[in-house]
A protein has these predicted regions:
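C-terminal accessory regions
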Residues: 133-275
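Conserved helicase motor core of P-loop NTPases
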Residues: 3-130
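Intrinsically disordered, low-complexity sequence elements enriched in Ser/Thr/Gly/Pro
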Residues: 2, 31, 230-234
């Protein structure tokens, strides 16, 4: 019987237990790939061909690659360029424009990376303002003569002059941080050795819970287990609280009720045969 292992593994992770990566009857896959080139190639094959063929998912709309970091060979900048090359390849029929980081072309999947409260959008004869940090959409047109692009976010079309292209990034791959608050039918996450400070339990939990129907982890099982074991964020706040306790003055001073402190710091599968 098909098992909802995403939910089970999410509970395990947040409780500090290692997730079950071996089930063959679940919605959570793990592929061991210890070389970056092998992990990247599998990711590209899954997003472009294997998941669409097996589940009918749209590579653009349903599948999201999520990764811990921006930089490095497994970071969003590099992965976006590779995913763009296979999902929206260069063509004489597709106009392009350039930002500092990326070459954009018509049809690209993009993300707004800073709040823009003033930009005007149009949808079904209605007008409004505001495209916000984390919104994901698509480039519908690039007007090189007019030096502007049209991006569509959930039916809202907004025009960006070229000088505002720094507000957009390719979004075939996004960081875990940028994925917060969103859900996707399928999540593909490469996890190999990278930046140790970024590999911790809450980050893995956040990534896993972005997946509605299907989660695929690619890389090293040891890295995944190390993330679960690394409760760095919780420890950071615990250490801060202990440090503040130690620095409390020994002399008791009279204070008014309005001056009282709040008192507590709060921290707001190996299944390749079926794919």
């Amino acid at each position: 019987m098909y098992k909802r292992q995403i939910i089970t593994n999410a509970h395990k992770i947040i409780q500090g237990e290692h997730p079950d990566l071996s089930r063959k009857d679940s919605d959570c896959f793990f592929f061991q790939r210890l070389q970056e080139k092998d992990a990247t190639q599998l990711m590209l094959d899954l997003v472009k061909t294997r998941l669409p063929n097996a589940y009918g998912y749209s590579p653009m709309e349903d599948i999201q690659v999520i990764t811990p970091s921006r930089k490095g060979s497994m970071g969003v900048i590099e992965l976006n360029q590779q995913l763009q090359a296979v999902l929206n390849p260069k063509s004489v029929d597709k106009p392009e424009c350039r930002s500092i980081l990326y070459t954009f072309r018509e049809g690209d999947k993009v993300m707004q990376i800073k709040n823009n409260y003033d930009i005007i959008w149009h949808k079904d004869g209605e007008n409004g303002t505001g495209i916000f940090n984390g919104d994901i959409g698509y480039l519908r047109a690039i007007n090189r003569q007019g030096q502007e692009v049209i991006a569509e976010f959930d039916g809202r079309r907004a025009t960006y002059p070229f000088e505002q292209l720094d507000q957009l990034e390719l979004a075939y791959a996004v960081t875990v941080h940028k994925s917060q608050g969103s859900e996707f039918q399928a999540v593909v996450m490469p996890l190999l050795g990278g930046f140790p400070k970024l590999y911790y339990r809450n980050l893995l939990y956040t990534a896993v819970t972005r997946a509605r129907r299907l989660l695929i982890l690619i890389g090293s099982q040891n890295v995944i287990y190390q993330m679960v074991d690394n409760n760095r964020r919780m420890n950071r706040y615990t250490c801060l609280r202990d440090m503040l306790e130690q620095q409390k003055p020994t002399q008791t001073l009279p204070i008014s009720q309005s001056d009282e402190p709040d008192g507590e710091i709060k921290d707001t599968q190996k299944q390749e045969e079926s794919l």
